């Protein structure tokens, strides 16, 4: 049937590109932030927490 071709799913390349999840964004700042919080406590890591928030915002996350 000729009408079915138009209803077929997108090519595999388009399906593989999924939106970035917050857990996977900014791994460098996330790792530094988490290590600081574990070692020193959250109250001593404000600069790393803010750096991670800025990175997330730059990627379009609303934090």
From Swiss-Prot:
Residue span, CHCH domain: 23-63
Quaternary structure and interacting proteins, as annotated: Interacts with COA1. Interacts with the chaperone CHCHD4; this is important for correct folding and the formation of disulfide bonds that stabilize the structure.
Record motif Cx9C motif 2, residues: 45-55
Intrachain disulfide bonds: 26-55, 36-45
Entry's localization field: Mitochondrion intermembrane space; Cytoplasm
GO CC terms of this entry: mitochondrial intermembrane space; mitochondrion
Species of the source: Mus musculus
Keyword Disulfide bond set for record: yes
The name this protein goes by in its record: Cytochrome c oxidase copper chaperone
Chief site of localization: mitochondrion
Motif range (Cx9C motif 1): 26-36
InterPro entries, per database record: Cys_alpha_HP_mot_SF (IPR009069), Cyt_c_oxidase_Cu-chaperone (IPR007745)
Gene: Cox17
GO molecular function: copper chaperone activity; copper ion binding; cuprous ion binding; enzyme activator activity
Keywords: Acetylation, Chaperone, Copper, Cytoplasm, Disulfide bond, Metal-binding, Mitochondrion
This protein's record includes keyword Translocase: no
Family per similarity comment: Belongs to the COX17 family.
